[in-house]
Amino acid sequence: MGIDVLTRLLTRRFLPTIFKREITHATHAGTPLSALLIDVDKFKHINDTWGHNTGDEILRKVAGAFYNNVRSCGYVFRYGGDEF
């Protein structure tokens, strides 16, 4: 339940715990903290037009791009569907 089978990212199950910990750390350390919620636009159209296998491949590629471009101390979650 903690790792998304399709994208191999953390699932939203861990988001509250990790986010709370990072907010506490940033507050105590006096360092900035950034969070993004990203939704893939028109994703239903992709699934409807090219099929779910293509949609799954796009989700894997998007997840990989996010994961590979986040600092080593950062986290990437698949919140659900096409939201990261």
Q: Can you describe what each PLM-predicted range is?
A:
Residues 6-7, 40-42, 50, 84:
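Hydrophobic/aromatic micro-motifs used in signal-transmission helices and low-complexity FG repeats
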Residues 11-34, 44-67, 77-81:
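Conserved long alpha-helical elements within nucleotide-processing catalytic cores of c-di-GMP signaling
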Residues 1-10, 24:
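Amphipathic HAMP/coiled-coil signal-transducing linker helices
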